[in-house]
Amino acid sequence: MKHIGRIVSFPIGLVLIAVGIIIFVVVNRTIKDEFKKAAVVIPDNGAEEIVDPWVRFIGNEGDPNNVRTYTFMAYNLTNPIETMQGHLPKYQEVGPYSYNYIYERINANLYEDDEKLSFKLWKRYFPIVADGYRDPTKDTIYHFNLVYGAAVKQAGSEVALSVALTAAAMGKIITGLTDPSFKVKAGFAAAPTVTAGAFSNLLTAAGNDPATACGLWQTSTSSSTPLVPFSVPIIAGSPSDISQAQCQALFDPSNKFSLTDPTNVGVYLLNPAGSKAALLASPFGLTSVQADLIMKYQLALTSTFVPTTLVSRFAECSDPKTCTNNPLYFGLLQWAKNPSLLGQSVFAIPNSGVPAAPEFGIYTSSELSLTKAGSLFLNTSTINLITPTSIGTILVYGQKLKADPTSIPPALYAPFSSGEFDAIVKYTGYIMAAFVDGDIIKNQIFKDYQGGPIVKHTVHDFLFNSTDPLLKLMYPDTPSAWVSSPLDNIQDVKVANATLHTDEIYTGVGDIDLVSSPITFEGEEELNYNKKIKVSGSFAEQLPPSYLSKDPEAPVNVFTDEFARSLSFRKEVGGNFGGIPYYRYRINESNWEINPDYFQTIPYLLNLTSIKSGAPAYLSRPRLKGIDVGYYYKAGITDLINDDEDLDVFADYEPRSGKAIHGRYSLQVNTYIQGSDGTNSTLYNKYSAFRSDVVHPMFWGVNIIAATQEQIDILTKAYKVDSFRYAITVILIVVGGFLSLISGGLFVLDKIIDL
């Protein structure tokens, strides 16, 4: 019997060992599956809501986990005038300003068997305006304008920018004059003089006899009379609708409302309601229908008789239709001729919208043929007035010809004569001075620090809600393009859908090690720095599950939208957060070193100019930590040199789930004026003067995230289950092993004794 007991104990021990192994494997697989489930970025992935990345990390405005606090500090330039005159700036750090920060991915679309996800990342900020908080909607600062900096950089200098603005002003001038609406405006502007003169001429042709004049006007069918006969059907009406007595009164120059008086004609056209009332109150005895008839006739003349009369005195318009039916020629008659089409500048017309006379002929007291004038507004012409390159050529040639009249061969500015080209040079300089420098720059861009290199805003508008007058000039019909604030803060989901970039990430389905990794940034798979750099790296808030548990010393590469690059992280320490073990990772110092591939020439100053449409944006750690102290002196922030507050980026990763359970995200936005120390910038060389090799701090922000207690409890539960699994497994294996070992040993011993 004792042999039977020992034989039975042996397989029982093996069974216990097997059960222990099975528990270990099954529980381990279950835990891993749960971690993966809590990492995969797809809707309805089965994860508990508080750890579901679709809710927690992608966003839900109703989820308090997704309402975070972002704190900003801004830099106020205290000497804006002196800075723009070439002195060193003096900045002052102001703040803090706190915001609730919500982000979510909208327009989400899964594809390629759910392995990839496209979306638009929608971020919103809401200022916390309450007791104990500074109000960013009231505090005002002066700061560098990235939009103006980008425009100057793209143009090549402020001088080049003025040339580009001159070309744009020329284009706007000729567009206004050659638009079909100018014919209407010209007809209205010239009608008082032209039609009143025609009525007077008709009266003169009739021997100053109102009765004869009325007969010619009302009944003649000949268009050879000095005025379009009333019987010629340019309006719906009958000559018999106005009696002879009424007509003669209208032709009598002594009457207050005579049609031979330019002032009256102007009143009829510009104030129809008032004119009608005046006509009805006059002694002419007009009925309401008759008054309407006269005013309709006057209005019809502005688009028929008046334009034809205006162009008929120009030899190039021997057939008036050649010029009245051609908007370009009609406008060029006003621009290129002296005297002009209207006999005066459009500047004299009320609400003309121009700061001075825009006409070439009027300003230069000379004129051009329509063919030559037209060539100046073709961008294919070597000499033209609508491309910056040609404007620059005209100005350079003009300077050389002024110094030496034989320095430029006439063939280079053909088809214009020497005198014509001199007039073009003179006119170009005039437009640059009067329209660009005197109006666009002074009155529209630089006025009251609304635009230009240094601007003035509330802190809130600076960060999220500013527009720039230069952008308004460049894109007059696209308000969405006027935004100049460095951070997006779109409040309307429809606007977000219409304007935000579509990006793509891996969901983790198929390959969990790719979870949340970016495929594109702002719609592109490569970053356009000094060389093409592929978008790659992990999502900062979700590393691949179990990645760190395999090797906590493994390098971590994280792609961040704000830094627009992949950053390498190094393990710093291990610790415990709310009962959960973690590893803390910080940005490697190597990320801040000089790197030609990223146009990075100054340690601890990351260059984003090629990514941000030429805007001179440079990122650093908050308070410029790490940068050479000389830049503190040149920015006037020496009080921050010895600041030792830890504001650096870090992330505490729970190694099994890969989730960032605690972390801090921070960066500072600056601009940098390139050039040699102690010299003035060659970029800012006309409207301002800036010192070279100076960092202008703008603002920094910090966002701290931490797992909630519920999330901690979920992860802690996993660790407790895991600990229980280990305990059960160890017990079963130890007990089973003991039974098998003892029973086997005793069985062998019994056999030996029996022998």
UniProtKB/Swiss-Prot annotation:
One of its GO terms (molecular function) is scavenger receptor activity. InterPro entries: CD36_fam. It is a multi-pass membrane protein. Residues 28-727 are lumenal. It comes from the Eukaryota. The chain crosses the membrane at residues 7-27, 728-748. Glycans are attached at N28, N76, N379, N465, N497, N588, N607, N680. Heavily glycosylated. Keywords: Glycoprotein, Lysosome, Membrane, Transmembrane, Transmembrane helix. It is found in: Lysosome membrane. GO terms for biological process: phagocytosis, engulfment. Pfam families: CD36. One of its GO terms (cellular component) is early phagosome. Disulfide bonds: none annotated. Residues 1-6, 749-755 are cytoplasmic. May act as a lysosomal receptor. May be involved in macropinocytosis and fluid phase exocytosis. Belongs to the CD36 family. This is Lysosome membrane protein 2-B. It comes from Dictyostelium discoideum (Social amoeba). The gene is lmpB.
